[in-house]
Structure formats: structure tokens, C-alpha cells
Amino acid sequence: MLKFRTVHGGLRLLGIRRTSTAPAASPNVRRLEYKPIKKVMVANRGEIAIRVFRACTELGIRTVAIYSEQDTGQMHRQKADEAYLIGRGLAPVQAYLHIPDIIKVAKENNVDAVHPGYGFLSERADFAQACQDAGVRFIGPSPEVVRKMGDKVEARAIAIAAGVPVVPGTDAPITSLHEAHEFSNTYGFPIIFKAAYGGGGRGMRVVHSYEELEENYTRAYSEALAAFGNGALFVEKFIEKPRHIEVQILGDQYGNILHLYERDCSIQRRHQKVVEIAPAAHLDPQLRTRLTSDSVKLAKQVGYENAGTVEFLVDRHGKHYFIEVNSRLQVEHTVTEEITDVDLVHAQIHVAEGRSLPDLGLRQENIRINGCAIQCRVTTEDPARSFQPDTGRIEVFRSGEGMGIRLDNASAFQGAVISPHYDSLLVKVIAHGKDHPTAATKMSRALAEFRVRGVKTNIAFLQNVLNNQQFLAGTVDTQFIDENPELFQLRPAQNRAQKLLHYLGHVMVNGPTTPIPVKASPSPTDPVVPAVPIGPPPAGFRDILLREGPEGFARAVRNHPGLLLMDTTFRDAHQSLLATRVRTHDLKKIAPYVAHNFSKLFSMENWGGATFDVAMRFLYECPWRRLQELRELIPNIPFQMLLRGANAVGYTNYPDNVVFKFCEVAKENGMDVFRVFDSLNYLPNMLLGMEAAGSAGGVVEAAISYTGDVADPSRTKYSLQYYMGLAEELVRAGTHILCIKDMAGLLKPTACTMLVSSLRDRFPDLPLHIHTHDTSGAGVAAMLACAQAGADVVDVAADSMSGMTSQPSMGALVACTRGTPLDTEVPMERVFDYSEYWEGARGLYAAFDCTATMKSGNSDVYENEIPGGQYTNLHFQAHSMGLGSKFKEVKKAYVEANQMLGDLIKVTPSSKIVGDLAQFMVQNGLSRAEAEAQAEELSFPRSVVEFLQGYIGVPHGGFPEPFRSKVLKDLPRVEGRPGASLPPLDLQALEKELVDRHGEEVTPEDVLSAAMYPDVFAHFKDFTATFGPLDSLNTRLFLQGPKIAEEFEVELERGKTLHIKALAVSDLNRAGQRQVFFELNGQLRSILVKDTQAMKEMHFHPKALKDVKGQIGAPMPGKVIDIKVVAGAKVAKGQPLCVLSAMKMETVVTSPMEGTVRKVHVTKDMTLEGDDLILEIE
């Protein structure tokens, strides 16, 4: 049995094969001594270093890596057998340009040969010479050839001598801006600056006019100096809309030169290649022959050896121009390898060992094109921000693989840190197929499989390129990206799982994201969802509405023999008891049960009112999505919303077109019945809302807000005659249904009988709907009295969500009417199950439950007339401020405030105005008499002042005088309907503004949310962009996050469920962050979460606030290399302010406005993160 010695760190056994299988020298060629290479150092980093290491390992060659201090954690140093630090104390790029250190490492570690990779020193003749002088082989051309080809001006002269056509340009590097001016005068614009000692797009700048000349010259020089250690430039005529075709060549030390056909590198931005294709599609065979023969001719002219690339521009007429020779391996060498089956790195190494191309079996006649290959460079750049590099920690990395896919990468793994110091390349994806469309399909599929989280990438942009018809046809040129702006219509990645982990981590570190009024944890048990039968739910009143329209629906309601119920559990009940905090997640769970078991309901109140803004403000949910999802789950029961007349679902007046559009879109999303009211019963506001709802095709239910007591002869302001007169106006305006909206629960049975019977007698064919609250405890009796007096519909809530400030009990009404002519036909057993679910669900909202401070309703509501939801809120506020014992004083002040304002109808927003004034009086220790007497000197709440100005309408009986005049003094007064004087809102302009801020995925619903609540909507969008679809989390997780070791599932959508386990939270790091560890679908995930409390005690550079005009933030992470202005300087729009450098690319930050620099927050050489504040302009 053969025994082999242990191999340490490399596959040296393969060396046996290498030495024993070397072919014999050709008898016709003078042989050089064959010197096997045993140890290779790659003087580079990243994926190209790994590419060479892999080739060496396959050949049994030991590998050596070098790395800078900034690259300590990079993968390339781990892929080598040995790795050594270079450039200690040097800048990141300079470390890889420090020839003495690199040579020292090579000599000290017995390196036979150095592979330069690409970039850095790969085209530096002095480096090739230094290797040669040190007795280390340079895997590339000779130093002299590197010098000639690296000097693009000399290369150009050689091309001319070889008879290869060239673009008009300077004969030598220019040394001044004056020379650039002279060239422009001779050849005209456009021209292009190019770095004389490197490529890759650095140091390249196209200039279209004299005005651009100086800035672009300066930037090109600076970039070339930073990237290649030499800022020399040459200038040439810029050929517009050419194809960029390059030919791969390979030579040996015996004068043999061959080509491996061409690559099309036309898809570029900033002269840097993005997608490369081999072979070039639809290339004329004669042009291909000219390109390849000229490339070989040029290589022979200089005695080229090893791998290289000859680059050409091909104009629209098929004429080609030599650009340059890259005397190194190219980034895109991979596509050539795929179509020719030639390993170029193997060939490079063998040539450096002294082997000839024929020895390697490489003869021109044997090189054939096999199919097509495409390479996409996946980078950490943001196409939406002009491809600005992004930096940070990769939280998730999952690549696309499979048949026909090759990946060349380096530090593309979870936990890798992308720094601003080097190139933004993350991974090269190479697809190979039988033809161009097949390769494009494979590439598109592979990119779709990628998941990169934590840093932005250009994947969405690449996918757009691959789906572009011009690209698929193969007819692209270097203007392809510029001429196809639709490539930048990027479909954002959903990234839902990672965003949810960020949210859960944030809550685990910082606590709840929504204000918690009471320290009470959610119930540990989930509510029990009753079983639901399979199949569609039974027909309900919505089927009649869809079939017969609003008029037919109203007739069916009026002709129904028994009492109909509207369930408020999905809106007003939880607004009254749970601070409007019930989430869509819990509504959706019980929704199918409601659809199947409560089809006899008149409607469900589930939208509008306070739920609209609270959904966005505190629950981070889209109210429109709630409507859409509930509509899908409950197709048979009409939905009802609360529309505040001209206020829609807001607290102020909006232009008429906003209200009309809102109703239109609400109807399109599934809303059926619009209960239109006005907080002052101000008829013009109500008529506008009714018209908007009616024109949208909805059922119009005009609601008269009730206050006072029609059965009390002493209460004359809001008498029976007042309500009957108002009802006449609303019926005349065409309401389909008439509603009495008793917000405080003031309707007593006697008053119910008087009011409802009078309305029934006057409007025998009109459906009557009564809404109340049970604050006094008389709600069930009142609703029974209404039903007996002729009401068609009364409001109820699930038993466990009824009573107190909510609606009367559903079960009580069902039981009391059972077996009578008013029978609701609702099964009691279903009511019990429904109530049981809500009893469990209510426990999840313990922190918001009114019973934390309020143990019962109170009949004093007949005196203070506080609406149900507001009663709960005021009670909460009083207790939270330690004034629980003084709640009686708050209620007394409420009564006085109401009288000061003229005895208002109290419902949002008028109830809030009364409440604000009451709290103002309590906080300042004012009685009514004192407040009225000092009215001219006091600074009343804004809501009170605006009410007195007339901004929400005119109250019944007019404004209180002289109180109004004392408060307003010289302030303007609104005459008539407030919204009538408002100009129409430009909804299209608003949509564009939202798209500019939030991206293309802006919907008509978003536009209306922003129109109603601009600040709330903006925060909601920013929050969910960071933390994802939070309505998919259960309520316990949403409020308090998971416990360590807790396992749970999150259903993102049907068929997509995440299995998550919380593992650990780390200690605080120096950046004020904690690392939170999870297991997601069996894989470890970790995220960094800022500890907001700890960060208050730490100093960080301020961020630019997007909403503050004049605050200029860093568009990308990077280093400040130049500051163009000082504090006090006048700046024009577009004027350069400073220059940032990141990933060897410089970005000029320009002024977005004209103004004066107020303060500069950065200094030269300062390193910035994205959005760090640079300066302020005023």
C-alpha cells in the first residue's frame, strides 16, 4: 500500500500529476527550461484572489494571500494556505500598492511566482520589474510589455505602427488643463479623459462642454491618482453610442499568440462594465475576423506573452477603433472560459512555468465557441441613487445556483462587513447556455434566487436589464443604460422576514413601539377561534346591495320583518374600550366565523373614524389594507364606515375633491354604507359628505348627532322640533337611510319612543338606524324602546366587548327579542362563541383596556354628556397623570367648557375641542367665570381658537359671544362652509411627491392617506419600510416581542410561513448596538439593534433630517476628501459643496437649493455614514 506524507494547507499531491504529465517539447520550437511553480502569492484581494487560489490548488500549488489591516476579516485570506499582513499603518488602498512590503512577504516565504490579479498593481511595470529583480516570477507579460501596454499613449502608438485603427487622441499624457482645452478646440466635444495607468472606469470622465472641463479634469486626475498611484491622464475624442468589444488573447514565451474570441462589454455605467457577454451577439463575421486578427497582430507587434485583452470601440457603421490593451486578467475573463472551455488562470500559470501553448493543447484551430455566457456583477450599489456604493454588514446572503450558473465571489456571506475602502463587487454571476436567450433566462432565474440583506445591491437593476427586449435582442451599445430609464424602475425587494426580525429585535432591546398607557402584559393565551364550515358563507344583505343597488338595499332593510343589528365590535366597541388598538391580525382571525354565522346582520361597522389614523399612527398598519382583507374574508355582510362629512376621516376640513376621491376609492375597496355625520350637525358639511358618498355609488346613511334630551321640556336648544327639521333636510337631500347617532348614550327609553316614533310617522318608508353607547347602563332598554317605536336597525357589540362606554350587548338584544315580532334571527349559540373569542382577544390588549382604571359605566354621563370613547380617554389620561382622584373635577370642567362654547353637540372633533378646553381649565385652575373674564389675555388651545374662527363649521345657535370676540380679537373668521374656500388639492402632484420619497409602489390609497394625515402617513411608510408587514405578527409579539428560546410561526401569506426562534441578546457594543440572534427556518440570523436608551449617553454624528429643507446629508458612506464651501458662503443650486470618496469612486455633493451655508458639520478626511449631516443651508 502506497504511503503519502501529510499535506498541510494545500493539495500538493496534485503536483505529482503535474510533473509527470508534462508533454514533451515540440521539436520545432526552441525550449526554455521548464520551471514548475510550487508556491504562488496573489498580490490582490477579494474574488480574483480566490479565483487564482482555486486554480493553484487544482494544480497542486501552495497559495499565499496578502491582506491590509482593513481586510482582516475578508474571505480571501482564509482561502489561501498562508496569509500575511501588509501595509501596516497605510491607507486601505495604499497597502495593496506598497511594492516593498509585497516583495518582502514573497521573499520571506519562498514564493515562486506572484499573480497580480486585476486592478491595484496588475498593470504597473515597476511592480513586474520588482518581482523579476527579486527572483520571483510575475504571472503576466514582461515588465517591458506591461510598461508599453500600461502607458495608453505608447500603446496607441504601437497600434498605429501595427496598422490597427485608433480613436483621435493625445500622443502623451496631458499635464495641464490648458492642453485639454487645446485638444477640445481641435477636435470638438464630446471628449473623454482616461487614466493613463489603469482602467475599470476610474479616472474616466466624459466632457460635453467647456463649462464641464475643469471640474471633470480635476476629478479624473484625483480618481486616477487614488486608484493607480499615478494621476496621469490622456484625452481623446469620445465616440458616441459605440459597442465596446474586447478580444481575449493568450501568448507564450515562444512567440505563439492566439485569440479566444470576443466579449461584448457595452452595458456600462460611468465607463464601468456591469454586464458582459461572450460572444458578442449579432456581430458581423467579417468584423469579428478583423477584430481578432488586429488583436493578434498587435500582440505580436510587442511580443506579448500570457493573458491580455485588446479593447475596441465599434461605431454604428461597423468601424472599429483600438482603445487599449489590458495586460492582465480581466474581471470578465469568466465568460470567455465558459464558451471556450479554456481555464485562463491555468494557462497563465503554465505559460509562466515555461510551457508553450501547443504544449497545453491550445491551437487556434481548436478554439471553438460553445454557446453563450453572460456575466453580471452583483455589487453593493444603489441604482436608485446613481449607483452610490453602500456599506454595512451583510445580514443575509443566499445565492442563486443550479445548472449553467457559476459564482465567483469573496466576502459574500452572512456577517461579512462591506467597507467603503474597496470595490463594491459582491459576487460575479456567470450563466452559460446554448444561446443568448437561454443564458439570459438562466441568469434571470439565478438572480431571482439571491437574497442579500443588510446592504443595498444592484440585483433589481440587473433583472431589469435581463428582461429588457433590446438586451434580449443583443443590440446594445454603451448608451444602453442612459437611453433606457425604465431600467431604474426598480421593484423593491419585500425582505419581509428580515424586516420582521429587525422589528422583533428592536422591541426586545427597546420595548414597545406603540405608547403603552398601563403596565399590563398581554394575556399568555391566544383567543379560541370557533370552527368555520368549508365553503362560501350564506347570502346576506350585501348580496341584495350588489344586485339591487342602494335604493333596493334600503327597501329590503325597511321591509325586513324583524329587528336588524349592526355589529360595532370591529370599530366603535374597541375604540371605546381598548383605545382603538385592536389590530387587523385579530380581526382577520374571527372574520370568517362572522361571515358564516352572522349573515343576517344589517352591516358591520369596521372602518373610518379614529381607526383610520390610529392604524397608521400606533399600529403601523395600512387602514386600506385592513378594509381589503376584511372584504375578502366577509363578502356577504355590508361594511359600514364613519365619514365625518367634510372632514372625511380626519380632524380638519379638506378640499372637496379630496373628500369625493376618498369616498370613490373607499367604495372601490369594498366599503358599502357611508354613515355621514358632522360634529356640529352643520348641514353644508353633511351635504358635501352625502354627495361624495352617493356619487361614489355607496349607500348614504345621514347621521344626526344627538345631544340633550328631547323628553325634557326644559332642554329647548336641541328639541324634538330641531331634530325633525334637520331630518327633513337630510331626507330631502336624498339619504338612503336615516341614523340617530347618540355618541354619549344620552337617549333614555322615553326620549327614544318620542324621537323614533315621530321620525317613523314622518318618514314611513325610510329605514331608521339608531346608534348609542351604554355608558349609563341603560343602552339595552333604550335600544328596545327604539325598536318598538319603529327603528329598523340598532347597534350592538359582542357581549364581551359591550357595556360601559361601548355599545349595548348583542346577546341581550338577541335574547330580549327572541320569539317576538322583533326577532333578530341571530342564533344565541353563535353569539356565545363570538363573545368567547373577543373575551380572549381582549386579554391581549390589557395595556389599553379601560377597565385598568374604569370599573363601570356611570349615569353621570346624562349630566356631562361626554361621548363614550372620549370618556374612556379622559379617564385614562387623568389616572396616568396621577389625577385619578380629580376625574370628577375634569368632568365638571367639561360641563363648564361645553357651556362656554355654547352647548355643543359633542362628537369628534367638537368633543375634542370641549375636552381640550376642559383640560386647559383644570391645568390652569380656572373656573368658567375666570376663563371668560380673562379670555382676552389667555392663550387658549389651538383647537378652541380654530373652532371659534369657524374652521369646522357653524354650531347650532351660533358662536358664543362675547367669548368668541375676546378670544379671537383680530384673528380672521371663516364665513360659510370651511372647505368651500379651499382650492382643490393636486392629487397627481402629491402622488409624484410620494413616489419621489417612497418609491414607485405608491397607490391611490396611499395618496389619500397622505392627503388626510401627511405626517402620520410619512412616519408610517418610513417605519414599515424598515420593519415590514407588522400585521402578520400576533399581538403579543407586536407589543412585547418574543422571550428568549420562544418558538413561533409568522404567516406572511397563504403558503408562506416563517418559523422563528429567539436565541439571545448580546451586551452593548461601542456603537451603542446590541446583537440579537434568531433562528429563522432553521438557519441562524443575527441583527444589530441600536439601544436607544444607551445611545442617549453616547455621542454620534448628527443625521440629516429628510424633512428639513437645507440639511444636506451624505448620499453614501465614505470619506470627505474635499470641502468646497465655508460657513457664511453663498451657494447656488447645483454648486459643489464637498467631495466624498468610497470604494475608489468620488462623488461630488451638490447644493439642492440656493442659499447661505449656515454651518459645516464635517472636516476633511472625516469618515461618514450614509445620511450623516454634512452642512446646513438657509
From Swiss-Prot:
<feature type="modified residue" description="N6-succinyllysine; alternate">
    <location>
        <position position="79"/>
    </location>
</feature>
<dbReference type="GO" id="GO:0005524">
    <property type="term" value="F:ATP binding"/>
</dbReference>
<feature type="domain" description="Biotin carboxylation">
    <location>
        <begin position="36"/>
        <end position="486"/>
    </location>
</feature>
<feature type="modified residue" description="N6-acetyllysine">
    <location>
        <position position="319"/>
    </location>
</feature>
<dbReference type="GO" id="GO:0042802">
    <property type="term" value="F:identical protein binding"/>
</dbReference>
<dbReference type="Pfam" id="PF02785">
    <property type="entry name" value="Biotin_carb_C"/>
</dbReference>
<dbReference type="Pfam" id="PF02786">
    <property type="entry name" value="CPSase_L_D2"/>
</dbReference>
<feature type="domain" description="Pyruvate carboxyltransferase">
    <location>
        <begin position="563"/>
        <end position="832"/>
    </location>
</feature>
<dbReference type="InterPro" id="IPR005930">
    <property type="entry name" value="Pyruv_COase"/>
</dbReference>
<keyword id="KW-0444">Lipid biosynthesis</keyword>
<keyword id="KW-0670">Pyruvate</keyword>
<feature type="modified residue" description="N6-acetyllysine">
    <location>
        <position position="748"/>
    </location>
</feature>
<dbReference type="InterPro" id="IPR013785">
    <property type="entry name" value="Aldolase_TIM"/>
</dbReference>
<dbReference type="InterPro" id="IPR005482">
    <property type="entry name" value="Biotin_COase_C"/>
</dbReference>
<feature type="modified residue" description="N6-acetyllysine">
    <location>
        <position position="992"/>
    </location>
</feature>
<feature type="modified residue" description="N6-acetyllysine">
    <location>
        <position position="35"/>
    </location>
</feature>
<keyword id="KW-0597">Phosphoprotein</keyword>
<feature type="modified residue" description="N6-acetyllysine">
    <location>
        <position position="589"/>
    </location>
</feature>
<feature type="modified residue" description="N6-acetyllysine">
    <location>
        <position position="148"/>
    </location>
</feature>
<dbReference type="InterPro" id="IPR001882">
    <property type="entry name" value="Biotin_BS"/>
</dbReference>
<dbReference type="InterPro" id="IPR005479">
    <property type="entry name" value="CbamoylP_synth_lsu-like_ATP-bd"/>
</dbReference>
<dbReference type="GO" id="GO:0019076">
    <property type="term" value="P:viral release from host cell"/>
</dbReference>
<feature type="modified residue" description="N6-acetyllysine">
    <location>
        <position position="1124"/>
    </location>
</feature>
<feature type="modified residue" description="N6-acetyllysine">
    <location>
        <position position="717"/>
    </location>
</feature>
<dbReference type="GO" id="GO:0006094">
    <property type="term" value="P:gluconeogenesis"/>
</dbReference>
<dbReference type="InterPro" id="IPR011053">
    <property type="entry name" value="Single_hybrid_motif"/>
</dbReference>
<dbReference type="GO" id="GO:0006739">
    <property type="term" value="P:NADP metabolic process"/>
</dbReference>
<dbReference type="GO" id="GO:0006734">
    <property type="term" value="P:NADH metabolic process"/>
</dbReference>
<feature type="binding site">
    <location>
        <position position="908"/>
    </location>
    <ligand>
        <name>substrate</name>
    </ligand>
</feature>
<keyword id="KW-0007">Acetylation</keyword>
<keyword id="KW-0436">Ligase</keyword>
<keyword id="KW-0496">Mitochondrion</keyword>
<feature type="binding site">
    <location>
        <position position="773"/>
    </location>
    <ligand>
        <name>Mn(2+)</name>
    </ligand>
</feature>
<feature type="binding site">
    <location>
        <position position="572"/>
    </location>
    <ligand>
        <name>Mn(2+)</name>
    </ligand>
</feature>
<feature type="modified residue" description="N6-acetyllysine">
    <location>
        <position position="434"/>
    </location>
</feature>
<feature type="modified residue" description="N6-succinyllysine">
    <location>
        <position position="442"/>
    </location>
</feature>
<dbReference type="Pfam" id="PF00682">
    <property type="entry name" value="HMGL-like"/>
</dbReference>
<feature type="modified residue" description="N6-acetyllysine">
    <location>
        <position position="39"/>
    </location>
</feature>
<feature type="binding site">
    <location>
        <position position="236"/>
    </location>
    <ligand>
        <name>ATP</name>
    </ligand>
</feature>
<feature type="modified residue" description="Phosphothreonine">
    <location>
        <position position="1003"/>
    </location>
</feature>
<feature type="modified residue" description="N6-acetyllysine">
    <location>
        <position position="661"/>
    </location>
</feature>
<keyword id="KW-0464">Manganese</keyword>
